[in-house]
């Protein structure tokens, strides 16, 4: 069983390299037309250049997974902001794409919790489609739209989970088919359990990104030993490895909050279940210390008898 690792957005080991520098709409409004254009251009350019720097860092450390920042373009989906964030930066998008393709990196997006399809309010669904379209346009500009995924949660229950799931199945029909093909769903830590999310994924033929921390915070009756093979099976039609999210609780009191690093003892039960399935898969580390937490976790795992470190960020068990 091969396990490849990656992390989210910021490389903590790099100085002043945020790929998510932003500006608020309030500050945007205070500027003149030219100042607005200049500020949007400068911040986006810096975010793209920092992303390129991070990708070089990942390549040097043999890190095959990376989640791009959704904030790479400030105010990209704001209805009162017009900005040609694709055309103005074509060379930089292409440079990012060239690095990803040359080094066979797996990158993804994870929009925020407001991008959902369970609401009974039409404008929420419209906003979700706008946000998914923005993420897809960026992947397309990079040249990887047909091989990269945009991951979201199912959404809220709004007092009636059954009705909310019905709305999800109806509202998702409004999302263009080419974008839906690049969509994944993740179980959350309060509302939709692993089993419930799996059922939706199976009906919609959407790959399931399993989050173990969320699963432990929002348990279902079905044992993980039964669920995990079915979760991995949702990826079968993609020819891409299943991906899981790993983090551990900040404390018993703040169980849902992410700790700075990974607690190996918390993760071990999942790893033993995964070993029984014995299917190659990718792991996205969601700890606060990002790449540093990932490298420390890999180091700790590689010390376990039977686990072999193939390279900096890949293990065999």
Curated annotation (Swiss-Prot):
* Protein's UniProt keywords contain Ribonucleoprotein: no
Q: What does this protein do?
A: Component in a DNA repair pathway. Removal of UV LIGHT damaged nucleotides. Recognizes pyrimidine dimers and cleave a phosphodiester bond immediately 5' to the lesion.
One Pfam family hit: UvdE
* PANTHER family, A to Z: UV-DAMAGE ENDONUCLEASE
Q: Which Gene3D superfamilies match?
A: Divalent-metal-dependent TIM barrel enzymes (3.20.20.150)
Protein origin, superkingdom: Bacteria
Q: Does the keyword Lipoprotein apply?
A: no
Q: Which InterPro entries match?
A: UvdE, UvdE_bac, Xyl_isomerase-like_sf
Q: Name one GO molecular function term.
A: endonuclease activity
Which UniProt keywords are listed?
Answer: DNA damage, DNA excision, DNA repair, Endonuclease, Hydrolase, Nuclease
* Catalytic activity, EC: 3.-.-.-
Please give the name of this protein: UV DNA damage endonuclease
Homology family = Belongs to the uve1/UvsE family.
Mind telling me which HAMAP family this protein's record contains? UV_endonuclease
Any one Gene Ontology BP term:
nucleotide-excision repair
């Amino acid at each position: 069983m091969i396990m490849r690792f990656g992390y989210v957005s910021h490389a903590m080991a790099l100085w002043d390299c945020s790929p998510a520098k932003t500006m608020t709409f309030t500050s945007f409004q205070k500027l003149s037309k030219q100042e607005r254009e200049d500020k949007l251009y400068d911040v986006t350019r810096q975010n793209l250049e920092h992303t390129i720097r991070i990708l070089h860092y990942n390549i040097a450390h043999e890190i095959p997974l990376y989640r791009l920042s959704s904030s790479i373009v400030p105010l990209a989906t704001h209805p009162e902001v017009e900005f040609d964030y694709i055309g103005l930066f074509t060379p930089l998008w292409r440079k990012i794409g060239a690095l990803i393709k040359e080094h066979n990196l797996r990158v993804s997006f994870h929009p925020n919790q407001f991008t959902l399809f369970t609401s009974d309010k039409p404008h929420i669904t419209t906003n979700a489609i706008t946000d998914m379209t923005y993420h897809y346009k960026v992947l397309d500009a990079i040249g990887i739209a047909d091989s990269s995924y945009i991951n979201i949660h199912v959404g809220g229950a709004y007092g009636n989970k059954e009705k909310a799931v019905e709305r999800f199945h109806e509202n998702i029909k409004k999302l263009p088919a080419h974008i839906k093909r690049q969509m994944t769903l993740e179980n959350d830590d309060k509302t939709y359990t692993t089993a419930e999310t799996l059922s939706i994924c199976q009906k919609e033929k959407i790959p399931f990104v399993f989050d173990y921390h969320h699963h432990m915070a929002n348990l279902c009756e079905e044992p993980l030993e039964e669920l995990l093979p079915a979760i991995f099976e949702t990826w079968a039609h993609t020819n891409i490895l299943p991906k899981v999210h790993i983090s551990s609780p900040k404390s018993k009191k703040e169980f849902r909050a992410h700790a700075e690093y990974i607690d190996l003892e918390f993760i071990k039960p999942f790893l033993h279940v995964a070993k029984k399935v014995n299917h190659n898969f990718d792991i996205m580390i969601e700890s606060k210390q990002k790449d540093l937490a990932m490298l420390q976790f890999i180091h700790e795992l590689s010390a376990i008898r039977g686990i072999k470190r193939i390279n900096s960020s890949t293990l065999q068990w």
